[in-house]
Amino acid sequence: MTECDVRVDLSGKRALVTGASSGIGAAVASALASNGAMVWVNHPSGATLEAAEAVVTGIVEAGGKAQPIQADVSREADVLKMFATLASKPLDILVNNAGIAHSSPIEALEVDDFDRLMGVHLRGTFLCTRSALKIMYAQNSGRIINTASQLAYIGAPGFSHYTAAKGAILSFTRSLALEIGERPITANCVAPGATMTPILADVPDDILEGIRQNIPAGRIADVEDIVGAYLFLASDAAGHFRGQCLSPNGGDAFL
């Protein structure tokens, strides 16, 4: 993984990144660590432990600090257990990034598949935020960064369930920022455009080329193009950003 060259001072900060065993989550975890934060690399199951450990190993070998931590964020019991592990420690940064994606026309979309996607994206964001806020309120500081998507704004055929979940995360973030109010805790989100992650790895080349042609920057983003937005929102420089959404998308959409 190519290292992001954005630099902020996160020395002494502690961060939890959900869905951090691959893709954007792994890149964000690595970038936070390379800027001084100690990072918990969340992954959902035993099947993803090896990938999470590889992310942790990369961080440690680069001189950073990280630990894997398992929880299926769609399951309340898992989230409560994960945060029980963190409860005695500060939590300065929460990145809600866990997500899944698959395409289906509405008439063929199974209810179980709809519920599972909503559970990981929206329920997971809610559950982790609820637990994190208890820590952040007690310490009177923190950064919450949720992962939405450019598609939440513009839609996409075959992804009605995915765009609905991401749109809900946008609204959740805005209301959360208002609820937090004057406290020195921020809630914002990042809405990436098309990014080369494992989700896009199986997309046929002709479709990827069509996506690329619609991007004024001339290419689909790498994960390193995305993480700068997360680093900024995690930093002290973003203290006056509340309920905002940054969308690194190469000019594909003006949001």
Regions found by a protein language model. Give the residues of each.
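Conserved glycine-rich Rossmann-like NAD(P)H-binding loop of the short-chain dehydrogenase/reductase
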Residues: 37-52
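Short C-terminal tail/terminal secondary-structure segment
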Residues: 2-6, 154, 214, 230-231, ...
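Substrate-binding pocket helix/loop in short-chain dehydrogenase/reductase
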Residues: 105-106, 110-118, 200, 211
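Alpha-helical segment proximal to the catalytic Tyr-Lys
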Residues: 134, 178-182, 239
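Residue(s) in the substrate-gating loop at a strand-loop-helix junction
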Residues: 149
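Active-site helix of classical SDR
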Residues: 129, 165, 173
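Conserved glycine-rich cofactor-binding loop
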Residues: 14, 21-22
